[in-house]
Amino acid sequence: LNPELGGKVLPAGSYILATQVLEKRLRQRLLPQNMAVCDQNVALDYYRLSADGRLLFGGACNYSGRDPRDIKAFMLPKLLRVFPELAGTAIEFQWGGMIGIGANRLPQIGRLKEYPNVFYAQAYSGHGLNATHMAAKLVAEAIRGESRGFDLFSRVPHMTFPGGPALRSPLLALGMLWHRMKDLL
C-alpha cells in the first residue's frame, strides 16, 4: 500500500453461514418482515433471508489475521444464540474473507497528496457491497471535475492506527476484546 494509506486500514476476517432452505412458516417466524438485521455490537453480527429461503448469518470479525479452521464451528454458537430453534438445521454453505476496517468505520475516499491524480476508496468496514457503488460514483464525478460530493468525503479525517506495522494488529485485537467485553455486559 501507499505509505499515506497503509496505516489507516486494518484487515479483519468476516464469516457467513447459510442454512438449508427453511420452511415458509419457519422463515416467517424467524424474520416476519423479511428484513436484513444487525445487532448494535461494535463487532456486529447480521442476518437475513436469501431469495431461495435460507438464513444467511454473518459477522464474528476476527482481527488476528488468521481464519478459523472451521467457519461453521466458529459461527454456529452465535447463530444459535439468536435463533435457538435452528438447532439441528443443516448448514449447507460457509465462507469468509478479509474486509478492510478504518478506525472511525467510515469509508475512506480521497486522492493522494503526492499524486493528486491518483484517487482511492477503501476501508468500507464490512459495508462494501453498499458503499462501493457510492464511492465509485463520487470518484467518477471527481475525475469529470464535479467534485462536490467527493470533496465532502475527502475532508473526513481518518486517523492512522497506533503501533506501527508490528503492533497495529495486536493493539487492535486488544481494543476489540475490550469492546467485546462491553458488548457482553
Describe the role of every protein-language-model region.
Residues L1-K24, Q28-P116:
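Active-site substrate-recognition segment that forms the wall
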Residues E114-Y120, Y124-L185:
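C-terminal lid/capping helical subdomain adjacent to the catalytic/cofactor pocket in oxidative enzymes
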